[in-house]
Curated annotation (Swiss-Prot):
Localisation: Cytoplasm
Protein's recorded name: 3-phosphoshikimate 1-carboxyvinyltransferase
GO biological process: amino acid biosynthetic process; aromatic amino acid family biosynthetic process; chorismate biosynthetic process
Organismal lineage: Bacteria, Pseudomonadati, Verrucomicrobiota, Opitutia, Opitutales
Summary of the function given for this chain in its UniProt record: Catalyzes the transfer of the enolpyruvyl moiety of phosphoenolpyruvate (PEP) to the 5-hydroxyl of shikimate-3-phosphate (S3P) to produce enolpyruvyl shikimate-3-phosphate and inorganic phosphate.
Keyword list, A-Z: Amino-acid biosynthesis, Aromatic amino acid biosynthesis, Cytoplasm, Transferase
InterPro entries reported for this sequence: Enolpyruvate_Tfrase_dom, Enolpyruvate_Tfrase_sf, EPSP_synthase, EPSP_synthase_CS, RNA3'P_cycl/enolpyr_Trfase_a/b
Residues binding phosphoenolpyruvate, per UniProt: 26, 100, 129, 177, 339, 381, 412
Organism (species): Opitutus terrae (strain DSM 11246 / JCM 15787 / PB90-1)
Signal peptide residues on this chain, from the entry's feature table: none
Length: 431
């Protein structure tokens, strides 16, 4: 059933119980799709995410000539016919919507292709997201990448002739996806490639890329430096089946839910911190510190490495026992929306005292203002984070006190989020 434009959040009146089957990781699904497309044999991805972002990636790979068979009930994506890719004689148009992973990865893939003309564009918000670091690096490796409207941004037109390899520098300060995209296509170059990072970067996502590439048969030599990476020219080769981990960022909402409403939730298959490929699994450690802090004590958390989860914590700070300072989030001003400014605005609308700087938020809990509507700015993480806050029975009678505008934006990464939340609420009443 389609979600309404304005969704009142029905609070939990009893503690949550049960378990949640999490969707597959978006970051891993789109990386694995790219690497599977670069193998020389069919690859089946199990536990894959089915959402707008991954569907955009799948649609683009099909337009590039690959076969991708999607079985949503089984949560599998089968990639084959790699030899048929990049054969089109006419220009190929690719649409990436607002999917940052698809946008960056496909740009690098098309630049590394042996032939063809590729035009890549997205929605208006995507045209504001940074691409310059990747574009400059691809050009330095011999790619012809044209920015057809504004330099450093979409839309792009790529006249492919492969990459020559050799030394190249990249500034990935605006998004680690820029570096990950370059790393994944570097083995396609005609000669070994030495990539030197010239900026700070979120290492958890880069480490994810390193480890996934290794599982697909390509290892990276750090060349005696933590910021220079060398890759020989070669091909990827993966097992015929590859399992995608459950999404650790999506898990953060359901890890926070028991803190808001009481009870316990099981999240089958979710890897603990340090065990899997996803840095966002460390959010559970943040919640442990939230629970342990003394009443009135300032809690400070640096989210630089796990910034996709900062909204989960920020949204529930009105319920916490003291002020919270969230740092390391300046780069999130250039994601789906300006997440720092948006979060400050919505919390203040709910009556909270918020101090906002370039890369920090400090929230001082105040009595919640009831009957407000949360603007999501088309950003799925705003919708899901504030939905968890709305699950607290603030009125004490089970009546909704908070509404979410455009809840359907969750389709970007977690299409059935609100359905799962409603199921958990009903189950809590039955227990």
């Amino acid at each position: 059933m389609p979600l309404p434009d304005l969704l009142p959040i029905a609070p939990f009146t009893r503690p949550v119980r049960g378990e949640v089957t999490l969707p597959g990781s978006k970051s891993l699904t789109n990386r694995a799709l790219l690497l599977a497309a670069l193998c020389d044999h069919p690859v089946v991805l199990t536990g894959a995410l089915f959402s707008e972002d991954t569907q955009l990636m799948v649609a683009a790979l099909r337009r590039l000539g690959l076969t991708v068979f999607a079985n949503e009930p089984a949560r599998t994506l089968a990639v084959s016919d790699q030899a048929s890719a990049f054969q089109a004689k006419a220009p190929v148009d690719l649409f990436v919507g607002l999917a940052g992973t698809a946008a960056r990865f496909l740009t690098a893939l098309c630049a590394a292709a042996p032939r063809g003309v590729y035009r890549i564009d997205g929605v208006s918000q995507m045209r504001k997201r940074p691409m310059r670091g990747l574009i400059d690096a691809l050009r330095a490796l011999g790619a012809e990448v044209r920015c057809t409207e504004r330099e450093g941004f979409f839309p792009l037109e790529i006249h492919a002739r492969g990459l020559r390899g050799g030394p190249v520098e990249i500034d990935a300060s605006e998004s680690s996806q820029l570096l990950s995209a370059l790393l994944m296509v570097a083995p396609l170059a005609r000669a070994a490639t030495q990539i030197t990072l010239t900026s700070d970067v979120r290492w958890t996502f880069v480490e994810m890329t390193f480890r996934l590439m290794a599982e697909f048969g390509v290892r990276i030599d750090h060349a005696g430096s933590s910021t220079t990476f060398e890759m020989k020219a070669g091909r990827y080769s993966a097992p015929s089946r590859y399992a995608i981990e459950p999404d650790a960022t999506a898990a953060s909402y359901f890890q926070a839910l028991p803190l808001v409403v009481g009870g316990t939730l099981a999240l089958p298959g979710l890897r603990p911190p340090g065990d899997g490929l996803q840095g966002d699994s460390a959010f559970v450690d943040v919640l442990a510190r939230v629970r342990a802090r003394a009443a009135g004590q300032l809690l400070e958390e640096n989210f630089h490495e796990i910034s996709d989860t900062f909204l989960t914590l920020a949204a529930i700070t009105p319920l916490l026992a003291g002020p919270t300072r969230i740092t390391g989030i300046a780069h999130t001003r250039q994601q789906e929306t300006d997440r720092v400014a948006g979060m400050a605005r919505e919390l203040m609308q709910l009556g909270q005292r918020v101090v906002e700087t370039r890369g920090e938020l400090e929230i001082h809990p105040q009595p919640l203002r009831l009957g407000e509507t949360i603007e999501t700015y088309g950003d799925h993480r705003f919708a899901m984070s504030f939905a968890i806050l709305g699950c607290r029975d603030v009125r004490g009678d089970g009546r909704p006190w908070l509404s979410i505008r455009d809840p359907a934006c969750c389709a970007k990464t977690f299409p059935n989020f609100f359905e799962l939340l409603a199921t958990l609420r009903q189950k809590s009443l039955a227990d």
